[in-house]
Each structure stands twice: as C-alpha cells, then as structure tokens.
C-alpha cells in the first residue's frame, strides 16, 4: 500500500514540475494564436 502512495507522489511531483516548466517557458508549438 505504501508503494502506491510513493508512486502517486512521484508521478504527481513530476507532473507538477513538467507543467511548471512548460507554462514558464514559451511553448515551442507552431500555434500563433497569441
């Protein structure tokens, strides 16, 4: 049961870091809406 908790915390932390870096830097996608 503890393994599931640690796995969930690890995935959530990586997701938060990923979105933080993605929204901090300008998206390098070919979308010129703004």
From Swiss-Prot:
Entry's Gene Ontology BP terms: photosynthesis
Main location group: plastid
Gene Ontology CC entries for this record: chloroplast thylakoid membrane; photosystem II reaction center
Entry keywords, A to Z: Chloroplast, Membrane, Photosynthesis, Photosystem II, Plastid, Thylakoid, Transmembrane, Transmembrane helix
Keyword Thylakoid: yes
A Pfam match: PsbT
Entry membrane topology: Single-pass membrane protein
TM annotation in the entry: 3-23
Compartment(s): Plastid, Chloroplast thylakoid membrane
Subunit-structure text: PSII is composed of 1 copy each of membrane proteins PsbA, PsbB, PsbC, PsbD, PsbE, PsbF, PsbH, PsbI, PsbJ, PsbK, PsbL, PsbM, PsbT, PsbY, PsbZ, Psb30/Ycf12, at least 3 peripheral proteins of the oxygen-evolving complex and a large number of cofactors. It forms dimeric complexes.
Family membership noted in the UniProt record: Belongs to the PsbT family.
HAMAP family named in the record: PSII_PsbT (MF_00808)
Job description of the protein: Found at the monomer-monomer interface of the photosystem II (PS II) dimer, plays a role in assembly and dimerization of PSII. PSII is a light-driven water plastoquinone oxidoreductase, using light energy to abstract electrons from H(2)O, generating a proton gradient subsequently used for ATP formation.
Protein name stated in the entry: Photosystem II reaction center protein T
Origin species: Atropa belladonna (Belladonna)
Gene: psbT
